[in-house]
Amino acid sequence: MVHPPVGIRSLAVSFPRVIRRNDYYIEKYPELVTQAEQKSLAKMFSLVGDIPSNEFELEMMPYLSDPFRGTVERRVLSPGESSLTLEYRAAKDALDAAKLSTDDVDILLVASFLPEQIGFGNAAFLARELGLQCGAWNLDATCASTPVSLQTACALVQAGGYRNALVVISCTYSRFFDEDDTLSWFFSDGAGAFVVSSLKPNQGILGTKTINTSILCDQFFFKLMEDEQGKQRLRMHVTKGINKAISETAASLLHTCCEGAISAAGITLEEIDFFIFNTASAWFASFCTRVLGIDPERTINVYPLYANIGPALTVGNLYHAAQLGKIHENDLVLIYAFGAASSASASVIRWGDVVLGPVPVNETDSTVKNSETGSIIPC
């Protein structure tokens, strides 16, 4: 069956105003930094044995002497900011870039990790802020939410029931960690949005492969706790065996999804012009290029700018790759992401004439790190 060409028409990102660098923690929590090897972040990312036992641990090795595990900057919500404010800004910028009004949006898909309130997703709340009249659906695939949402939106538009789908992704990890928890050094906040519409012939989504990640179901969990003011707050926790679980499954998930998407698209790995990975650690892009045997120049790593922003990482990497001119119209792009207790997913798309939203606040003089050489590429 031949599907009409459907894919990303515009793309935008949004980040909090506060940029928190390593010096902040060194000055405020010197004892924590000194004792980092006994704290939660170090326990999350350390060798299972005495020597690397797989590609993931091999790429992690150079970062083990760094108490921040390669993290450089984080974006953190400031007073008055929330997942909804980030989502609203990204959504508006994506619509403006596509030259669409709210009346042109036929469906809103929102993946918030996590929503602002317990029990309800952000979709209807964001629709209210945007003034949308269309349906508003919540979608959750944890850190794989971007490719899963892209697949869903493309399928809806290809089926003919919708013309323009607005997809919004956010992650606000800072709400779920105390600042003096070393795990908070690794996580960050951000959002992205894109419009999915009809494109030129042969452009858009060409093939996908998604599998579940039930093997990682028990590695992350949330607890409802009371803070010092007696307010109930969700706090995120990780198990002691998380590093072993991720390092032993990451390569298999990557191979299965990427090879499946490439096969579904009817192409070969060598034909892919550029790769987008959810770079949830400083070394994940290098890990992926090693496992797939591809040139590191064919991908990008925004981790030095944003740390781990969960599902929003994929949108951030896409945005900066396009902004830097690494992706051009009609290039073949492979997008891969995986999330614990959800899915691993890959999509092959032929890039269209994608219009970008404005460069985010505080981003004008920022930099993106080349995953192979460690050099800095100006944005």
Label every PLM stretch briefly.
Residues 1-80, 181-248, 256, 350-379:
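Condensing-enzyme catalytic core mediating Claisen C-C bond formation in acyl metabolism
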Residues 8, 94, 105-108, 149, ...:
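Buried hydrophobic positions in well-ordered alpha/beta secondary-structure cores of metabolic enzymes
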Residues 19-20, 119-122, 151, 176-181, ...:
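Short acidic, glycine/serine/threonine-rich loops at helix termini
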Residues 59-63, 75-141, 257, 261-285:
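Conserved beta-ketoacyl condensing-enzyme motif
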Residues 88, 114-116, 125-128, 133-159, ...:
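Claisen-condensing/thiolase-fold acyl-transfer catalytic domains that form or cleave C-C bonds
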